[in-house]
Amino acid sequence: MELKGTKTEKNLWEAFAGESQARNKYTYFASMAKKEGYEQLAAIFEETAGNEKEHAKIWFKLLCGGAIPDTLTCLDMAAGGEHDEWTEMYPRMAKEAKEEGFNQIAALFTMVAQIEKEHEERYLKLAQNIEDGT
């Protein structure tokens, strides 16, 4: 069956995003727990973050047809994601933040957009290196 365009595909993307966000949050929580001297709690957060990473990997593999793609495809996907972030997502977010009076947040969105542009350029160069065999 074709997954593209289905509710299930949408749900897989939502599950992937949720697990990915949880992993990052738990990693941040582990850092704070360590900083505050709660080593056991930090270890629990880190273990759970690892679980969330594996959950995200399950959903991502399904979205990719059952396996993580080859490196060249990964570079192309990464470049495309970075391109969307710096050309569409962050400019829109910066504009909206500025309209709402959050000028510092708007500036951060703009700054990160520039970094995402550099990421795209790097991925494209690396993909070209693979294609050229260098």
Where are these regions (language model features)?
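Non-heme di-metal
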Residues: M1-T134
